[in-house]
Amino acid sequence: MNYNKKSIEDIDVKGKKVLVRCDFNVPLNEGKITDENRLVGALPTIKYLMGKGAKIILCSHMGKPKGEPKKELSLLPVAKRLSEMLNKEVIFADDDNVVGENAKKAVEDMKDGDVVLLQNTRYRKEETKNEEVFSKELASLADVFVNDAFGTAHRAHCSTVGVTNYLKEAACGYLIQKELKFLGNAVEKPERPFVAILGGAKVSDKINVINNLLDKVDTLIIGGGMGYTFLKAQGYTIGNSLVEEDKVEYSKEMIDKAKEKGVNLLLPIDNVVADKFDKDASPVVTEDQNIGEGYMGLDIGPKTAKIYSDAIKSAKTVVWNGPMGVFEFKSFANGTIEVAKAMADSDAVTIIGGGDSAAAVNILGFGDKMTHISTGGGASLEFLEGKELPGIAALNDK
């Protein structure tokens, strides 16, 4: 995949109508935004375009309205909050069909530096099917397309891919540019030693990632629920731990592949277990890899955490995707905390691949110590799998 894409700085936007696909899929509680990280992330691109005298038309999805208007998924709260953040009114074009009379009039009346926000793109059923009719309507409002929504870059939708068939200038905003820089370098030309850490519940979610990364990394660390399938593959007992029986054979193949490639594959050597999946369950640390009958693994053990931390400390590039245990339960958060600490203390380029690991790092207060926290869980995973992301591929090459 070519990561060298035109950015907003490579195109002339003065006086032009610029359609910007943002990721404003923010959590709401009674119409109030409870986490505005995604709005903050979009500001540099919007402010740059304002400063250059562009006419800025913002669009985004929110939630899953499944192709029909749902009042609770309206982008009105986003327009209000953005107006405050930009110190400038963001005109909300409230059309159930997204590109309706309100949108057309708002765009027609725009002066250089003005900002309009369209209604939730997923109010239209065509959006997720990437159907021409809606792509054409969106494109008809603008002269230039800018994609700054990395979180949906792995989806071929009207507002991420379809519009580029009708707008010949298509560039990335600052958010996507940053993602391409850090994730692209990690995958293509990492500074070594390159360590990848994979956690989370399921091997099946990470099959292609494990396979692809074994061709690239010096050390691969496995933790979280998926670790128990690997332990079973090595012949250890795992009690009542989460296991994917149909992935045990695959895990054996990956252990062999790591040996062949000379990759240091690190798996748990001790575990924190309990007799039930409960925040109040009493944690017990196992002597070794084996987990007794009636117990389930809920975190990596202290010896494992030490080995993983040491591997991180000697790295020059670290990519982390997925927690080491059930970090929402205090008794089983230590593995995740130790990994986050080791990354925070490291001089390496440290990249967090969105989703649960990003949440964990932010909750633990290590966010500002990481080189880059990806804004897309699914998109960053597909990136690490080596897949081409349609929303990136559709942009102009430099």
Curated annotation (Swiss-Prot):
Pathway: Carbohydrate degradation; glycolysis; pyruvate from D-glyceraldehyde 3-phosphate: step 2/5. One of its GO terms (molecular function) is ADP binding. It holds the Pfam family PGK. It is found in: Cytoplasm. It is an enzyme of class 2 (transferase). It catalyses: (2R)-3-phosphoglycerate + ATP = (2R)-3-phospho-glyceroyl phosphate + ADP. CDD domains: Phosphoglycerate_kinase. Its EC number is 2.7.2.3. Substrate binds at residues 23-25, 38, 61-64, 122, 155. InterPro entries: Phosphoglycerate_kinase, Phosphoglycerate_kinase_CS, Phosphoglycerate_kinase_N, Phosphoglycerate_kinase_sf. GO terms for biological process: gluconeogenesis; glycolytic process. Belongs to the phosphoglycerate kinase family. This is Phosphoglycerate kinase. It comes from Clostridium botulinum (strain Langeland / NCTC 10281 / Type F).
